[in-house]
């Protein structure tokens, strides 16, 4: 890189005037002084030398201290050149001055040449010296600025060289790191690609190792077996050796014949024992086969029995559902739904009575108005009261409920001579119930308060009955009251036209054509507690009149109308008088046998066992058979409530076919 170019450009840039003057003077010199070629050539040579020395340095060469030496040499040469240049310039100016003189001599012929020459010389010398001093100062400044700029440029070049070298080194390091990263990435990619192969190799190695383990374990087992066998053989040989040693040591040995006999006997015993063992093994096999056959046969039997039991259980459930439905229907049609209503003072002051007796009577013996009043209050009271009474009697779950429902049939079944009569009676019951279901039941929704009060009182009555001990109910034989029944029949015949007139009266709740049939009344006798309960009084209180306190809690028009009818028609008012019954000390075994047989046929042996346990605490009455036969021979319109009291908690009652659609037999549980 040459230094002449930048120096000239710098000089021209900083001092353009001087550059122009120098250019002009140089051109003048070249034109006016052709006789000074050596100085110019020498200066050019010096400048070229410095340029060549400067140009010899390559841009990529490192920084050396020789550069300062070269710069100092170039400065000295430049100064010498500039010192030589003013002398040349002075000579050139002299030549110009001479030329001007010549021109002046031509124009001014009058002035002499000597005078002019002596007058102009000091002036020119002073001007030349001043100009030379100025030029020297300017040149010195220009050279110092030039050198300073050159040094700055050199420093910048050195910095750039250092930066370039650092960048080259960094690039080399970065290339090395890049190569390392590329190698690592390649290894990672290769490892990812080779993962399945590596896994397969690993699995193969594991399989091989497992096979080797198995083989080694098998070998160890075989060697252990061999060792055991060898140990056994060694022990046997030792035993044999010991026996032989003992024999050899013994001196007094028996003869061979005896020994052979002993051996034969022992061998025979061994053979016999082997035969016995074989025979026993055969017997064991045969016995096992027989036992397996028996087990399979018994399993089949058990499966068949289980299937039969399942079917029977389904049938029992179906029958129980039917019985529940029949009981509900009978409870809805119960006569005593509104009868047992008493003036109870305090529920806690009276002792509680517990009994499960069913009462049954003919509805046609009641007065016409009370019958109408009962028809309005029959459905809701009975359902709630019976459910609550069942809850109080026992909380033993679904089994006791099913037993209680099954207990509904025994009185009807026991009063019949055989199973066919019971089936026939059950069919008649179902037909009559269907007939009654077809007829619409009349309800009065305006007496809900009265019903709730009756329900609460009935619950208290049930609790009182549960606490009291059960008492024997005496039933009077109907034949003993024959004269009274004849009198009542005559009185009924007299009062029949009045009843027919009453039937013609308009009534919204009753049917249009109601006929009250004539039938004999049966007189019954009860204990004080039961009589008080019938009259609606507490069990511990005194007796109450049957006619006056029958309906103490009836309200509204029905109450007043019923009282008027009782006053006008005292014969129509229902005054139950039950027949006396004679007690039997001996138990009726035939009755129990028939009952148990029928219950076995209908419900199975389990129920009979339970029923026998419950029936031991209940007394039987001989008149029940007579009443059952009478009921069997009587027509359904004249059937009475003779079978009201049985040995079970709930009884099933035949419904009575009456002329009116709302009349019928009802059942209640006390």
Swiss-Prot record:
Residues 52-61 have a biased composition (Low complexity). One of its GO terms (biological process) is intraciliary transport. One of its GO terms (cellular component) is axoneme. Keywords: Coiled coil. Residues 1-63, 373-399, 413-453 are annotated as: Disordered. Disulfide bonds: none annotated. Residues 418-436 have a biased composition (Basic and acidic residues). Residues 145-335, 418-468 form a coiled coil. Belongs to the LCA5 family. This is Lebercilin-like protein. The gene is LCA5L.
